[in-house]
UniProtKB/Swiss-Prot annotation:
Record-stated family: Belongs to the bacterial ribosomal protein bL19 family.
Protein's name according to its UniProt entry: Large ribosomal subunit protein bL19
Chain intervals for the UniProt region annotation (Disordered): 114-145
Keywords for this protein: Ribonucleoprotein, Ribosomal protein
GO cellular component: cytosolic large ribosomal subunit
Keyword Transcription regulation: no
Length: 145
């Protein structure tokens, strides 16, 4: 691994510090909880929409989320390692055949829908078993501290 890649990995680990970024791709519907500063206080605002693109790599990686707000299309670009992002949650997986879904900008209503990627029962069972196992391990590790 070259020096720049090592430094980027180190910085990414420092920026994440306890946060986990789920695996998501264009076509997935995500909820991004963003920290918004209003005067003295800070609050968390949820922004839900379809991820239409992922750009860059390493620390500069970003993604674009599009939603329809009061009949008007709104797009917002987020840096993955931004300290302003509180959390990212994947609501549903989309089945698409493109990396950039910019064609959704021209579509309205039913033509802008994205088919949901269905998970096989076996894959779902293994995912849930891993989730339970991780939860149990976390629960067992907590009293030891």
């Amino acid at each position: 691994m070259n020096i720049i890649a090592e430094l980027e990995a180190e910085q990414a680990a420092k920026l994440l510090a306890g946060k986990t970024i789920p695996e998501f791709q264009p076509g997935d519907t995500v909820i991004v909880n963003v920290k918004v500063k209003e005067g003295e206080r800070t609050r968390v605002q949820a922004y839900e929409g379809v991820c239409i693109a992922r750009n860059g790599g390493g620390l500069n990686e970003s993604f674009t989320v599009r939603k329809i707000s009061y009949g008007e299309g709104v797009e917002r670009v987020f840096a993955i390692y931004s300290p302003n992002i509180d959390s990212i949650k994947v609501v549903r997986r989309g089945k698409v055949r493109r990396a950039k879904l910019y064609y959704l900008r021209d579509r309205r209503g039913k033509s802008a829908r994205i088919a949901e990627k269905m998970e096989s029962p076996a894959a779902k069972a293994t995912r849930e078993a891993a989730k339970k196992e991780a939860k149990a391990a976390k629960k067992n590790a907590a009293p030891a501290e």
